[in-house]
Amino acid sequence: MNIFKALFGSKSKPAEEVKKDVTRDFNVLKYDGVRALRERQFDYAIQCLLRAIEINGADLECRDNLSQAFIATDNLSQAYEQLQKMAEECPDNIAVLLRMADVAYMMENYTAMADVCEKAMMLDGDNVQVYFYYAKACCGHGDLTNAVVMLSKALLLNADFDAARLLRGELLLESGDVEEAAEDADTLCARIEGNEDVLLLKARVEKAKGCMAEAEIAYGKVIDANPFSIDAYRERGEVRKALGNDEGANADEAAANEMQQEPPQPTEGIEQNIKKKMQQMDPYKVFNNE
């Protein structure tokens, strides 16, 4: 009986005291959840934050943290649900809509992604990230033409948006517009040195133009940037074969096959990559407090 008295009290408490207890319980659960999120104890963070939201469902910061924990545990539909509730409360918040678009992309729900982007575009027609996400939604639907249009709009707003230029170059090349793809590749090469994706685009452009000697050199730069690039070895092998270098072509093909059978297991940089991703999704700087 004493245990129950300790837990529930021997008599009813005044309303003000009960309110204080509820507030205290909410704060303890919320900040335990935030701390667990920082320490990457995601399952425990979810438990705490769900219980906190049961007490106070109007706390949007709590829902934001919960959405991040769900994303980290690959519970994307639950994350999207939390973001939807945040968007209902803050319909003018572009950051929430962009997060929804990002999660929809991870779920491969390109229709939802496009819908969210349209809402965001109505709020801020000059937000380059909105056009970038819309382009990715178009790509998901196989609509490369409109994807290029969206990326071009983003680049008109910000010519230094390298991710948009890279994706546009890749799509232009895929669509057979080699000359315009070459312009994007050259612009990126002048701006970014030693980037694997940029170098690979440049190599593929040279190959598509039929400039095999230049393509071979470009693929070599890709391999310098990433010695484990299976695509670079395989495609350079094709280029070397076209140049009549059968020995080099066979060596590249063998290297690609070997890496495909036993893919390299990187031991460094994984945690930093995860942390960087979480920071991108973190308007409250939960992960950016170091």
Feature names for model-found ranges:
Residues 1-19, 31, 122, 136-139, ...:
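Intrinsically disordered, low-complexity, charge-biased linker/tail regions
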Residues 40-47, 73-85, 107-119, 140-153, ...:
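Structural signature of tandem alpha-helical TPR/SEL1-like repeats
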Residues 53, 87, 121, 155, ...:
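A conserved position within tetratricopeptide repeats
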Residues 57, 91, 125, 159, ...:
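Short coil turns that delineate tetratricopeptide repeat
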Residues 19-61, 65-72, 95, 99-108, ...:
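Alpha-helical segment of the N-proximal tetratricopeptide repeat
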Residues 224-230, 234-264:
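TPR/TPR-like (Sel1-like) alpha-helical repeat modules
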